[in-house]
C-alpha cells in the first residue's frame, strides 16, 4: 500500500488536548470533531488539509489523556497517516482501532509542506520534492489487518465476530 500526501509538521509531545481540546468533546459527530482538529495548536489546520495528507511529528505524539476523539478528529479531517519518531502507546492503539495509520520514523528531514510517498510494504518514505528516502517502521500482522479493514469494528464485522452495534455475536 502506498500513501502520498503533503506533510503537516508538528513538534514533540503533541498531546490529545491540543489535538482536540476539551470544549469540543461534547459531540459524537466525527466531522464536527474534525472541524476542530489541532485547535490547541492551529485553529486553521482543518482548512489546510487535503484528503490523503499526513501529519509529521517528533517524539511522543498523542500523549496526554486517552481520548479516542483525538484519533477520530485526525482521521475525519482527511489525514491518512501520522509519521512520528514515537507515539504515546494508547494513541498508537487507538489509531490502529480507528483505522488511522501510525508510522515510526526519524522525521528530522521532513519539513512542513513536503510531499511524501509512504510505501508500507517496503517500509520507506520518499520525500518526493527532495528525492530523499527514509526508512520507517509500519504496523505489521494483526495491526495491518485491522488497518486494511478500516479499523477494529470493520475488522470484527468482516470476521463475523460482531453482528451490529448491539453486541458480540454468540
UniProtKB/Swiss-Prot annotation:
Q: Which InterPro entries match?
A: Aconitase/3IPM_dehydase_swvl, AconitaseA/IPMdHydase_ssu_swvl, IPMI_Swivel, LeuD, LeuD_type2/HacB/DmdB
Enzyme Commission (EC) number: 4.2.1.114
Keyword Lyase found: yes
UniProt keywords, alphabetically: Lyase
Q: What Gene3D superfamilies does UniProt report for this protein, alphabetically?
A: Aconitase, domain 4
**How does the annotation summarize its subunit structure?**
Heterotetramer of 2 HacA and 2 HacB proteins. Cannot form a complex with LeuC.
User: What protein does this entry describe?
Assistant: Methanogen homoaconitase small subunit
Amino acid at each position: 500500500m502506498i500513501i502520498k500526501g503533503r506533510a503537516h509538521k508538528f513538534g514533540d509531545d503533541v498531546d490529545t488536548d491540543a489535538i482536540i481540546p476539551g470544549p469540543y468533546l461534547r459531540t459524537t459527530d466525527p466531522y464536527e470533531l474534525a472541524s476542530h482538529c489541532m485547535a490547541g495548536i492551529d485553529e486553521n489546520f482543518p482548512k489546510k488539509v487535503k484528503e490523503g495528507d499526513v501529519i509529521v511529528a517528533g517524539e511522543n505524539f498523542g500523549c496526554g489523556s486517552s481520548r479516542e476523539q483525538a484519533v477520530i478528529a485526525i482521521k475525519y479531517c482527511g489525514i491518512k497517516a501520522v509519521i512520528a519518531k514515537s507515539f504515546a502507546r494508547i494513541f498508537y492503539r487507538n489509531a490502529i482501532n480507528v483505522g488511522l495509520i501510525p508510522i515510526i520514523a526519524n522525521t528530522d528531514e521532513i519539513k512542513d509542506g513536503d510531499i511524501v510517498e509512504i510505501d508500507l510494504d517496503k517500509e520507506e518514505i520518499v520525500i518526493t520534492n527532495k528525492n530523499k528516502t527514509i526508512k520507517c517502521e509500519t504496523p505489521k500482522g494483526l495491526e495491518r489487518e485491522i488497518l486494511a479493514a478500516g479499523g477494529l469494528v470493520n475488522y470484527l464485522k468482516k470476521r463475523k465476530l460482531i453482528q451490529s452495534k448491539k453486541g458480540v455475536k454468540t
